[in-house]
Amino acid sequence: MAGKSPEEQHPVKAYGWAATDSSGILSPFKFSRRATGDHDVRVKILYAGVCHSDLQSARNDMGCFTYPLVPGFETVGTATEVGSKVTKVKVGDKVAVGIMVGSCGKCDECVNDRECYCPEVITSYGRIDHDGTPTYGGFSSETVANEKFVFCFPEKLPMAAGAPLLNAGVSVYSAMRFYGLDKPGMHLGVVGLGGLGHLAVKFAKAFGVKVTVISTSTSKKGEAINDLGADAFLVSTDAEQMQAGSGTLDGILDTVPVVHPIEALLGLLKNHTKLVLVGATMGSFELPILPLGVGRKSVVSTIGGSTKETQEMLDFAAEHDITASVEIIPMDYVNTAMERIEKGDVRYRFVIDIGNTLTPPES
């Protein structure tokens, strides 16, 4: 008799919402999770952030996912079971799971605390885990992960407003830290005022950095300055404003998740500085070489953050009262939320109330 598949051997029944084809429409879905291993933490999911990457992944815009796919990179809940060798978490603790649940643990990236760049990184959904089964994300009743990829969620942080820190938060935090854009007194430009952009402003201000928000939308000026504490605002389609800002920035974080012109942005940079593209932008940018060369400017990119950076970011956020500005939604609103994300109709992040609104499928 043929042996059971690894997935059939999973004893823990779970449920969530999954995309089953490239329409990206999510619907109720039953599946199973593995038993809690010696180094694992089982998490009852209470809140899950919804990000632009979830929309792209559900539709398989990147061409690298299979179905069914349960999204969710920003997961917060409580530990319900811990393995015998787990040391940093106990049952009942507030915990979080971000964009990764595994890596090889042996390569140069892993041994230097850069697991998100491991060639064998296992993301929280849409990948194959070490046991040969697909990973399913946070739009679900529970999850289980190796304790290395489970984070202690500070008591001071509210769960719902803190959930987006697990992807959006660490993405901008890691970019600022790694590229040295976190020094007090620096002048940083933040392009885009969405999920990543609004958190970039909050972290930058906590670092003591002067912030200019750059947007195509004049209506966001009040939000940027009055609500988020930015120091200045530039309309990127206003040639006079952009000229006035020429050569004033020590760096730029570009958080816009779609391809857009960047030549005018390069003009805002001082010489010998960089524009950092943050996040999983699809497509290719047109890169003007001469404006880069004459000022020795750089265009670089980053995505996500390591486990070490993620825990540091959560602790820093708790210390400085940094949370996302969120709209809390029920599970069955998720498809409408995805549509609104594509239209830019959210201030600034959707978070699903998993604990109170996710119910088991009827059949």
Curated annotation (Swiss-Prot):
Under InterPro entries, the record lists: ADH-like_C, ADH-like_N, CAD-like, GroES-like_sf, NAD(P)-bd_dom_sf, PKS_ER
- Tell me where in this chain the Enoyl reductase (ER) domain is found: 24-352
Any idea which GO molecular function terms this record carries?
oxidoreductase activity, acting on the CH-OH group of donors, NAD or NADP as acceptor
- What's the practical application here? The strictosidine aglycone-producing AJM7-DeltaHYS yeast strain expressing pathway genes of the VOM module, RsGS, SBE (GsSBE, RsSBE1 or RsSBE2), RsPNAE, RsVS and RsVH, accumulates vomilenine. Additionnal expression of pathway genes of the AJM module, RsVR, RsDHVR, AAE (RsAAE1 or RsAAE2) and RsNNMT, leads to the production of ajmaline. Ajmaline is an anti-arrhythmic alkaloid commercially used as an efficient drug for the treatment of arrhythmic heart disorder.
Sorted alphabetically, which keywords does the UniProt record give? Alkaloid metabolism, Cytoplasm, Metal-binding, NADP, Oxidoreductase, Zinc
Q: Where does the record place a coiled coil?
A: none
Q: In which tissues is it expressed?
A: Mainly expressed in mature roots and, to a lower extent, in stems and leaves.
Its top-level enzyme class, in one word, is oxidoreductase
List of residues binding Zn(2+) 1: C51, D54, E74
Which Pfam families does the annotation name?
Answer: ADH_N (PF08240), ADH_zinc_N (PF00107)
Q: Give the intrachain disulfide bonds.
A: none
Summarize the temperature dependence annotation. Answer: Optimum temperature is 37 degrees Celsius.
Where does it reside?
Cytoplasm
What is the free-text note on the cofactor? Binds 2 Zn(2+) ions per subunit.
**Gene Ontology biological-process entries:** alkaloid metabolic process
Q: In which pathway does it act?
A: Alkaloid biosynthesis; ajmaline biosynthesis
TM spans (from-to): none
| Catalytic activity, as annotated | 17-O-acetylnorajmaline + NADP(+) = (2R)-1,2-dihydrovomilenine + NADPH + 2 H(+); (20S)-19,20-dihydrovomilenine + NADP(+) = vomilenine + NADPH + H(+)
Q: What is its EC number?
A: 1.3.1.73, 1.5.1.-
Positions of NADP(+) binding? S53, L193, G195, L196, S215, T216, S217, K220, K221, V278, A280, T302, R349
pH-activity relationship: Optimum pH is 6.
Subunit relationships: Homodimer.
Q: What name is this protein filed under?
A: 1,2-Dihydrovomilenine reductase
Which source organism does the UniProt entry give?
Rauvolfia serpentina
